[in-house]
Amino acid sequence: MRALVTGGAKRLGKEIAIFLAERGFDVAIHYHSSENSADELVKYIKSKLGKNCVALRADLINEKEVQTLISRANENLGGPISCLVNNASIF
């Protein structure tokens, strides 16, 4: 099982990513500007939960970047994502 969580580096998105990893999902964590937070979460999920995890940057307003995000998530997680959590927002 593979999931992509948009806005997954902090707050609710972070908790969703951890929740999914705890339940057996490999997780792609999307971020726009929170690279350090995303990288720390990837380390946590890999080391503490033993799941494949990757942080991927994209501007979700840009269609080409969204397509690249999905392709890279599929590539890095070893197959197509089966779960998409649209959590990204603008504060």
Locate the predicted segments by residue:
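Canonical Rossmann dinucleotide-binding motif of NAD(H)/NADP(H)-dependent dehydrogenases/reductases
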Residues: 1-28
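Amphipathic, non-transmembrane alpha-helical secondary structure
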Residues: 14, 18, 22, 39, ...
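Conserved glycine-rich Rossmann-like NAD(P)H-binding loop of the short-chain dehydrogenase/reductase
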Residues: 23-40
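Hydrophobic anchor at the start of a short beta-strand
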Residues: 27, 52-53
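The beta1-alpha1 cofactor-binding region of Rossmann-like NAD(H)/NADP(H)-dependent oxidoreductases
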Residues: 35-36, 57-70
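Short, conserved SAM-binding/catalytic segment
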Residues: 41-49
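A glycine-rich helix->loop->beta "capping" turn
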Residues: 49-52, 72-86
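Conserved NAD(P)H cofactor-binding loop of Rossmann-fold oxidoreductase domains
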Residues: 87-91
